[in-house]
Amino acid sequence: MVRLITYPSIDADNYLQKKTLDDANVSVQVAQVLETIRCRGVEAVFEYTKRFDGATVNEANFRVSEAEIDEAYSKVDPEVLAALRRARDNIRRYHEKQLRPSWIEPEADGTMLGQLIRPLERVGTYVPGGLASYPSSVLMNAVPAKVAGVPQVVMATPPGKDGSINPYTLVAAREAGVDEIYRMGGAQAVAAMAYGAGLKAVDKITGPGNIYVTLAKKQVYGTVDIDMLAGPSEILVIADETAPPAYVAADFLSQVEHDVRAAAVLVTPSEILARAVEGEIQRQMDYLPRREIMEQALKDNSAVIVVKDLDEACEVANRYAPEHLEVLTKEPFALLGKLTQAGAIFLGPYSPEPVGDYYAGPNHVLPTGGTARFYSPLNVDTFMKKTSVIAYSKARFEQAADDILALAKCEGLDAHANAVAVRIEK
């Protein structure tokens, strides 16, 4: 079911070569949706919602009312609500540690240089929906935005066919401090938030979605900022002979239940463990739902890679640059410094990926598809902008003038040079 690959090899090289996220046909469809909404506004959003979600949305029910959110509280399990609040508090505490103050540094001659670090004014967050419930995605996007100080956080989530929003999604939104909630999903939601169709336009859009949402975010980038381009979920597990096969198998399956495009990778120097994990995967799938999805994802996208030693395992992990990286070895912290490319690293047998996905505090909006090489997890800085401050004194200006003139003339920008020259006292 799961391919077995020896590293290094051509098979390993081929497997570790990441696939592109782009889909030409979907890109064209998304572009049409964006252009239609840009030109026609919110009425086009309503039409697409009817076509794609089967829900009737209009001016009267587009924005979720406070009364509907109040009612949602009566529909949720009190134990789940308590767990959501504890998770929210963990997420808030973790992200508060990321806050940095603005700074301005005066110098002896009166010059001042600095940086203002301030929150964005208005952020839109996308939460997958319909009949499904993803309250954890609400918390992971909205709580850091509020920690950053964003005054207006807008949420878009697709309605069910009856127009309803899952009550857990609504409750999580209020608990996280979301200010406005709209019934819309897909590329049309991204377009509405970016172009201001039926609501005030946002400055940035965050949150996961399907390929239509992801490519819509890609196409509106520049009109608004985005967090990242998220692809299918993935996990890579580095394990040695001390790892319990049942743990590795369970963590594999926790990822591939997401989607037939999800991927799970085991990298191990132990062929005995590799065989044991294969057996455990089969055993655990017998009592889990979504078997067809898991089998397809394991067959199409997943692998067991056998390496010489743990140093080689780290090399493979860094090439793959996974969204989630688990280390189930005798000395997991010994590998931490060698693992340089990952969205999140989970160390030890009691740090399975769901601990981070739901509860511990670090963000679960993570780079996928190898983009952990240059993207970071969603964080407080995601919702901040930085402005440079320059206040030169007369003495510093006169001291630097000749250097600035030389550089401006070198680049052939005479008006730049003139802006300095007119200030030099003769």
From Swiss-Prot:
KW ATP-binding (keyword) present: no
Cofactor(s) required, per the database record: Zn(2+)
Catalytic activity of the protein: L-histidinol + 2 NAD(+) + H2O = L-histidine + 2 NADH + 3 H(+)
Pathway(s) this gene product operates in, as recorded in its UniProt entry: Amino-acid biosynthesis; L-histidine biosynthesis; L-histidine from 5-phospho-alpha-D-ribose 1-diphosphate: step 9/9
Pfam families: Histidinol_dh (PF00815)
UniProt signal peptide: none
Residues annotated as binding NAD(+): Y126, Q188, N210
Record keywords: Amino-acid biosynthesis, Histidine biosynthesis, Metal-binding, NAD, Oxidoreductase, Zinc
Enzyme Commission number: 1.1.1.23
Gene Ontology MF term list: histidinol dehydrogenase activity; metal ion binding; NAD binding
Annotated substrate binding sites: S233, Q255, H258, H324, D357, E411, H416
Cofactor note: Binds 1 zinc ion per subunit.
A GO cellular component annotation in the UniProt record: cytosol
Catalytic site positions: E323, H324
Binding site for Zn(2+): Q255, H258, D357, H416
Single GO BP term: L-histidine biosynthetic process
PANTHER family per UniProt: HISTIDINE BIOSYNTHESIS TRIFUNCTIONAL PROTEIN, HISTIDINOL DEHYDROGENASE HDH
Entry's family note: Belongs to the histidinol dehydrogenase family.
Cited NCBIfam families: hisD (TIGR00069)
Main function: Catalyzes the sequential NAD-dependent oxidations of L-histidinol to L-histidinaldehyde and then to L-histidine.
Name of the protein this chain belongs to: Histidinol dehydrogenase
